[in-house]
Design a protein with these regions (language model features):
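P-loop NTPase motor domains
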Residues: 1-24, 29, 73-85, 89-281, ...
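Post-Walker A helix-loop "phosphate-sensing" segment adjacent to the P-loop in P-loop NTPases
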Residues: 56-67, 236
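Conserved lysine of the Walker
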Residues: 46
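Short coil/loop residues immediately preceding or within conserved phosphate-binding loops
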Residues: 33
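C-terminal regions of RecA-like/P-loop NTPase motor modules
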Residues: 41-42, 293-376
Length: 376
């Protein structure tokens, strides 16, 4: 290892340099591109690392906002301890968020039906299959969106936002046959058994720490749920930047490969990944399936272009990680033999071995661990 140090003014602690013993103090906002990837085998400590970062950032930056996509219900104890909001998403969940919620921006003056057109078209592609979307469908969807957002615009944005159920009704009420065909495809998500995203928002989405728990989400609803969450997060990121340009937004995608398996969600995510920096937002992908990411063009671009990468213990994917980041043989061995909480941080051009063991007799450890028998 070459001796390198990270000591960013105003940063947070990521542990100790395994070579020098000095503290590693870093801040992703200081990088040109502060998006991050955290990669490790199961049990390597990636969940603990990410939760510690969230905890420190939340306490350090009191106006920052946080969104966590949680497929395994691992983040709820931390979120609840900090007074955040856990949004449980499933077919029969009592909590709802409306992906058609809209906040008007006086600076851009973009009307809601224009802002939501891309999302709704992607939603229809997801439900109907991209090959079944016709050339004129976008115009029909635009007409329906303009219709359902008209009361909101006429009220100067004081009326309730429309829902997917309103969109379904608007399409069904249009006279042409094709609109009714699109409405029929949407019906199960508007009034049927999959209407989880067709309700007005009934949770506190103004909370600065929100966790989307999708553990109980069925496979049939999952693609629509992923798109709806990404749309909601994108809208929130832009709204946060307008309301307070100096306050960063942090977005965490655990088991990010679940999003990347679906082409529409992957494309939506990659677009967000590239433009988040413009809105003072920082995305983090967390995965134990490095090889799956390396064989996915979108995921590979995200891995290769993230300036902040945390590599914890690696086994079967070690050679792929070594090749991607140009690791030396000592660095390779360090990752192979790493204990939970040990690894290598790539920050900009620096590659630093670190260790960050957490005392097991603390409330913080019990709050952050996912090991059976150790949780509070």
């Amino acid at each position: 290892f070459n001796t390198q140090e990270i000591l960013t003014p105003g940063g947070i602690c990521y542990g100790r340099n395994a070579v020098t013993g000095n503290l590693i103090i870093g801040l992703r906002t200081s990088l040109v591109n502060g998006n991050a990837m955290v990669v490790a085998t199961s049990g390597g400590g990636k969940s603990m690392f990410v939760k510690l970062e969230i905890l420190m950032l939340y306490l350090r930056f009191t106006k920052a906002r946080f969104y966590v996509v949680d497929p395994e219900n691992e983040y709820a104890p931390l979120v609840q301890e900090l007074g955040g909001e856990v949004v449980n998403i499933s077919v029969d969940s009592a909590t709802h968020f409306n992906p058609l919620d809209f906040k008007y921006d006086k600076a851009t003056k973009i009307p809601p039906h224009v802002a939501k057109a891309e999302f709704v078209l992607s939603l229809c592609e997801q439900i109907m299959g991209k090959e079944h979307i016709l050339a004129g469908d976008k115009s029909l969807i635009d007409d329906a969106l303009e219709n359902i957002y008209k009361p909101l615009m006429e009220s100067h944005y004081t009326a309730p936002c429309p829902t997917i159920k309103d969109l379904w009704m608007a399409l069904n009420n249009q006279r042409d046959k094709r609109s009714k065909e699109i409405a029929l495809a949407l019906r199960i998500f508007a009034t049927g058994s999959m209407q989880a995203f067709a309700q007005p928002t009934n949770v506190d989405m103004s909370n600065r720490l929100i966790c989307f728990n999708i553990q109980s989400l069925g496979e049939q609803l999952k693609p629509v749920a992923m798109l709806s969450m990404l749309e909601y997060i994108n809208t929130a990121v832009m709204s946060n930047e307008r309301n307070d340009p100096k306050a960063a937004t942090w977005v965490y995608f655990d088991e990010i490969y679940l999003l990347l398996r679906d082409s529409l969600s992957a494309n939506f995510l990659y677009t967000s990944w590239k433009r988040f920096r413009k809105y003072n937002a920082y995305a983090t992908g967390i995965t134990q399936n490095v090889q799956d990411c390396l064989t996915n063009d979108t995921a590979y671009a995200m891995l290769a272009n993230s300036e902040f990468v945390v590599m914890l213990r690696q086994t079967k994917d070690i050679d792929s990680v070594v090749e991607l980041y140009g690791l030396s043989e000592p660095q390779r061995k360090y990752l192979l033999l790493a204990q939970p909480g040990e690894g290598i941080i790539k920050m900009g051009n620096s590659l630093i071995p670190f260790n960050n063991p957490q005392p097991k007799d603390t409330k913080t450890y019990k709050l952050l661990t996912t090991k059976p028998g150790e949780m509070e």
